[in-house]
């Protein structure tokens, strides 16, 4: 599937680039239903132009040229004329300007004088004036006055007052901020207009009452003691115990994993990658699949492995689709052992298979779902890796753990087996043959993948959501890529693919 998407990207980028390069033609265009050839100059000559007057007065020199559904002013030598301005207007304008400047200067001077007067005033005098207006000094010749009797209960707002609230109430009862009242000595502090409501000591008592447990001095001391001294000791003990537990668990897991790996290595030491009996030296590396047997599910955790490597957890829809294609392994007959193994096992049977190599190629792009990040990485340059190493060999050999293009028999030419019927025609065969000759792919391209590639290019908006995302990505690439840069990047590959340089990819 990665090959299908790569080639779809390359084909559509080349088509858009060549269309953009051949867009600015200077030749006249042919009408769709007529043999008449016309250019822009011919059309201008056919449309009659006439001169219109702007006004009905014959002395007016302004004229308009009407034609081609446009109107523009004609250039005249006497279009701009100098109008004499009376002296009275000039004198009045100068007088208004001078008066405005004088008023602005006067306002600025007033502001400067005010700032200078405020600058000399000391701060202490201002504070003394404010304090003098707010309160009066106590009379030392008179005794202290008890202004409230039930203040502890009022401040605490509960049935029983705390010790610290009692102390605050004692301080609040002794009022020496003002002279003795002529009326009764006790007032109700709960009244909305009580004289004692806004006093400074009442506010202090209310601030002290905010702590609900302020009266319990022993509990408060114990809390401070734990938070300052014992808390760090407890944390150190917890971290040490947790560290020892984690280390012991890691050691136990490591010993268990090493023992399991050694047993698995001994059991798999003499086993081939795929049990293909009667393989000769000159025979293919992979035997053709048995059509009588159903595909084998070789791994059940491919979606989660791909999601972890692509840093996209949980797996998205496109990862499930890729995993569904990779998990159905019908390149060889079914193995005799268990059909479900782990794909990330260090010695698993899936490690050196072709589908694992395809998954690793998909893993190269870390932001496969992020179109903007994909574009910032200059993906057109990244596509040039398809053309690297154009040597004599079109593909890597099996020694490098890659597959070679296999010449299958005619009765099994479409591999892997598709899930639905594949329509084969001459066009598909030509595109597939030209594709294999033009590109140096890191994996073998099957005919089914070529059919999928053409389907993506033809479906466009009438396809699945994943194909729509691929088409939108291709449009972004086609808009932002310079058409002059495409021939340099893709060079002779598309010339081979097209067969003729004059033809365009539809």
Curated annotation (Swiss-Prot):
Intervals of motif RxLR-dEER: 50-71
High-level lineage: Eukaryota, Sar, Stramenopiles, Oomycota, Peronosporales
Cellular component per GO, a single term: host cell nucleus
Domain of life: Eukaryota
Domain remark in the UniProt entry: The RxLR-dEER motif acts to carry the protein into the host cell cytoplasm through binding to cell surface phosphatidylinositol-3-phosphate.
Organism, as annotated: Plasmopara viticola
Protein name: Secreted RxLR effector protein 134
Cell compartments where the protein resides: Secreted; Host nucleus
Keyword Ribosomal protein set for record: no
Alphabetized UniProt keyword annotations: Host nucleus, Secreted, Signal, Virulence
Signal peptide: 1-19
Family: Belongs to the RxLR effector family.
Function: Secreted effector that completely suppresses the host cell death induced by cell death-inducing proteins.
